[in-house]
């Protein structure tokens, strides 16, 4: 029988045998002792077992309006894209719940194409959807993919990322979401099929066809290239939702040409082109994607096309302040942990938005701009106990002037004089 104490009379954990001096806590029960380390280990084991037993249920998928409302909390603007995504996602998981058949009518899968400029929110929309639905989510970069037989990443490695996101629970992964970014970069270089092989373009599209439509794929557990005598993970992609996003730079002239507008013109025609410039992507059709360089079979696997508009100054200011995880709120929280209040003046927010537009980075570039502005302040403040408030002004952003620092006695300093 296990002894509860050693020769020196110290109490021991009944499970691991460590003495009370070797652990932080020893909990006593009827005729038994357990240490904090064993409690933590047991908790992890139970949680893992419970997670395995949980079946992936999608009976409570939010309605499209509810999905849209949650997206509004994290993503500013892009109303048309949100509506299209909400409907497509709801129908996708409704299709899964119906076991793909209703009265012998087979419901086809509706993968999604997201078209919009860099930093307009494509990746964030896909990530937020996965969070809403509580499903595994993986991001892949189309530019790293090549067709089988060439140096590069096999398309099956996309599926491995999803399996890893599901903690290697294949059944759970089979109902996840995969976002393939930069899909426009695998467009073939010409509308006409090339005689020579296009390793980075059409070949990748061909390789993606099967997994987009639905197939049982063999995935190497460790990633990399397949080789003989290797064990594979079998995963059915029929119920995986694929969202393919890209900026599709250069598609606007194709759309305008189809709409009968001249790409280069004078007078009223030029004025019309300028008026419609912001909304030209809202007119995109599958035939435009074909002319851009996607093959017909690939376009057919993406029946839902949602476009995102370029973000203007007002939208970028809203992105800085309104979402639940807005950047301004994040930086305010960071300084709050050092007992300092952070304030962004309205003029500063407008200048930050202008810089992002100038750099053509959209919302993606906002964080790097603020990080640059806050570097000196965040370096100095943790060592200062007399600072109560930090104010970023328009001059701070536009002319690299130091932020205002307010001392606890009300004195206003700048970073140059506060050292």
Curated annotation (Swiss-Prot):
It comes from the Bacteria. GO terms for cellular component: HslUV protease complex. ATP binds at residues 117-124. Keywords: ATP-binding, Chaperone, Metal-binding, Nucleotide-binding, Zinc. Zn(2+) binds at residues 13, 16, 35, 38. InterPro entries: AAA+_ATPase (IPR003593), ATP-dep_Clp_protease_ClpX (IPR050052), ATPase_AAA_core (IPR003959), Clp_ATPase_C (IPR019489), Clp_protease_ATP-bd_su_ClpX (IPR004487), ClpX_bact (IPR046425), P-loop_NTPase (IPR027417), Znf_CppX_C4 (IPR010603). Residues 1-54 form the ClpX-type ZB domain. This is ATP-dependent Clp protease ATP-binding subunit ClpX. It comes from Bacillus cytotoxicus (strain DSM 22905 / CIP 110041 / 391-98 / NVH 391-98). The lineage of its organism: Bacteria, Bacillati, Bacillota, Bacilli, Bacillales.
